[in-house]
Amino acid sequence: MEDRQALEEAGEEMGFPVVNISGGGRGRRGNYSNDGSGARELSLRVNEEVTEPPYNSITYAEVLRLYRQNGFSFFLSNLHFEQIKYFEHREGEGDLGAIIREHGKIVLDPNVVYHLRRPLKIQSLCYIVGRGAVIKVHASVGQQAVHVYRQLDISPRIMGMLNVTFLECKFHWADDEGVNFERLARHFTLFFLTYESVFFACDFVGFPGLTLRSTCLLRVEGCTFTSCAVGIHHADVADLKVKACYFNHCSVCIFADGPADVLRNCATNCDCFVIMEQEGSVVGNSVVYKLPPSRADDLMICQQGYMYPLSSIHIVRNLSCEYPKLKNNVFSHVDMHVGLRQGLQHFNQCNLSFVYCMLETESVPKVSFYSSYIQTLTVAQIVQFSREHSRECQCFCGGRHRLLFPSVVHITPTVVPDRTRFTVDVEELSDDE
């Protein structure tokens, strides 16, 4: 009884509403009787206006203490992001992982360069505001720099802090002497995400291997990827959302092995912009130029026993999925690969300039360029694979395979619509906004 009373008093000091739902015992307003007055009093208590803690008034450590004492009380209270005190972390103030576990809401100093030399494990909800601070990830960190996961009931759910969030952080790769870079690059992962995460306005510069590897719901918005081997690798039934990001000099920007929405991004001088293995949408993107031949790698992808050279926009063969939605994109000086799927593949209001599109044989009647803005387009159909000409290439699965070069025939006149027969003054080519 004394412990419960102490807990209620501590909750009142923090500003949490304390409700006695037992109908008896001692609450904040005295004793309740069993004649029904307790139920009436409870109804009045629930409907009255609750006084919430003011801005920046509660430390995350205090919230954890109360949560561990009585986790059920958090179902009866409203706790928001702005009420949590932020902790200003400066270099040399302790281990970052321990600080995240203790404080949750952390603000970095933009005038300090932070260094990550040991693997970091994030196992609770957190919100990290970088304010443009640079975090250098050293090669000595090993094959996995940051592992994000959440243990059950280790932290409460706070409105506005429902995910692991990184805001305005700049992650830079730093080589270390004595580290086998080639071996590390094949297996390196900057972020291994197994809990819902958000990256907002972050920079990633020069990372080998996988920059963001996710097996859960992931949102990447307003971020920049520069000289990264693979920007985003998503493999889960949960959705991936990549919005308003910029990719420059990356080998592979987005590999979506699950539902994905790729919206209003820009990619320049990248070998592959997106690999779509499941359904999704690619809307409002601008993809210009591939990597120059001197810097490009011979990349390929294997799927269901088929092996193809990797293209800038690669729609993987998948008989159980429909084609992704492509609309309002600008593709210039790139190539595309369209595999066999269900339904039809339309390039609605897409600008195709100096584009080479390679179609698998079965997918030829399923592709339509009727609603596209065709500047310079070459369409080729794969007829067979030549056994006389082959090359060993690096596959996206991590191994190396011998790729047989496809033999193609150009079918551009048969798939490009005859504009003398079809007018452009139609709804499919008009602006619907």
Curated annotation (Swiss-Prot):
The protein's role, per its UniProt record: Plays a major role to prevent cellular inhibition of viral genome replication. Assembles an SCF-like E3 ubiquitin ligase complex based on the cellular proteins ELOB, ELOC, CUL5 and RBX1, in cooperation with viral E4orf6. This viral RING-type ligase ubiquitinates cellular substrates and targets them to proteasomal degradation: TP53/p53, LIG4, MRE11-RAD50-NBS1 (MRN) complex, ITGA3, DAXX and BLM. E1B-55K probably acts as the substrate-specific adapter of the SCF-like E3 ubiquitin ligase complex.
Predominant location: host cell
Name of the protein: E1B 55 kDa protein
Family: Belongs to the adenoviridae E1B 55 kDa protein family.
Provenance organism: Murine adenovirus A serotype 1
Top-rank taxon: Viruses
Lineage: Viruses, Varidnaviria, Bamfordvirae, Preplasmiviricota, Tectiliviricetes
Record keywords, A-Z: Early protein, Host cytoplasm, Host nucleus, Host-virus interaction, Modulation of host cell apoptosis by virus
GO biological process, one term: symbiont-mediated perturbation of host apoptosis
GO MF term set: ubiquitin-like ligase-substrate adaptor activity
Coiled coil stretches, renumbered: none
